[in-house]
């Protein structure tokens, strides 16, 4: 991993219209931890609350899941996720990348079962685990597209 990436604190978002998964990761140790679900109102976050979370964790990079169809086409949800990512970048001036989130939901559900077996799933949902998986995929291949 390039040295410039090793000190990054990464925050990832699995965008949704009713709720959004959030995770935080530390690039130096390639960690990723799902956080509690964030409520959304028709795809719009409470920006004051979201910015409090950002201030608390002080990320240096944002990843926002890009919900693509299996044929690589974008959907209405893709456009809304891009809009969220652009506004997030504008509100914070933090570098923001869109990352392909296909297949993370299925993987996240499997991971959630593991959390439930360990009794750690009270506030964690598949959406937050999906955000955590976005960070893990970034560690393996740090590539994305501009919002």
Swiss-Prot record:
Q: In which compartments does the protein localize?
A: Cytoplasm
Q: Name one GO cellular component term.
A: cytosol
A Pfam family cross-referenced in the UniProt record is RuvX
Q: Which UniProt keywords apply?
A: Cytoplasm, Hydrolase, Nuclease, Ribosome biogenesis
Q: EC annotation? A: 3.1.-.-
Main EC class of this protein?
hydrolase
Q: Does the keyword Cytoplasm apply?
A: yes
Q: Name one GO biological process term.
A: rRNA 5'-end processing
Tell whether DNA damage is among the UniProt keywords: no
Source organism, top-level taxon: Bacteria
Q: Name one GO molecular function term.
A: nuclease activity
SMART domains documented for this protein:
YqgFc
Among InterPro entries, the record links this protein to: RNaseH-like_sf, YqgF, YqgF/RNaseH-like_dom, YqgF/RNaseH-like_dom_sf
Family indicated by similarity: Belongs to the YqgF nuclease family.
Family matches, as PANTHER family? POLYNUCLEOTIDYL TRANSFERASE, RIBONUCLEASE H-LIKE SUPERFAMILY PROTEIN (PTHR33317:SF4)
What does it do? Answer: Could be a nuclease involved in processing of the 5'-end of pre-16S rRNA.
What name goes with this protein?
Putative pre-16S rRNA nuclease
User: Species name for this entry?
Assistant: Acinetobacter baylyi (strain ATCC 33305 / BD413 / ADP1)
For this protein's source organism, the top of the classification is:
Bacteria, Pseudomonadati, Pseudomonadota, Gammaproteobacteria, Moraxellales
């Amino acid at each position: 991993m390039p040295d410039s990436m090793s000190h990054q604190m990464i925050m990832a978002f699995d965008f949704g219209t009713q709720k959004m998964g959030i995770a935080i990761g530390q690039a130096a140790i390639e960690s990723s931890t799902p956080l509690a679900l964030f409520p959304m109102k028709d795809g719009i976050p409470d920006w004051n609350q979201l910015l409090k979370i950002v201030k608390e964790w002080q990320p240096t990079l944002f990843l926002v899941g890009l919900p693509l169809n299996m044929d690589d086409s974008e959907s209405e949800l893709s456009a809304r996720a891009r809009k969220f990512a652009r506004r997030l970048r504008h509100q914070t001036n933090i570098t923001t990348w869109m990352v392909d989130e296909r297949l993370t939901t299925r993987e996240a559900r499997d991971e959630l079962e593991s959390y439930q077996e360990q009794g750690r799933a009270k506030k964690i949902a598949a959406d937050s685990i999906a955000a955590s998986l976005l960070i893990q995929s970034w560690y393996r291949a740090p590539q994305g597209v501009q919002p």
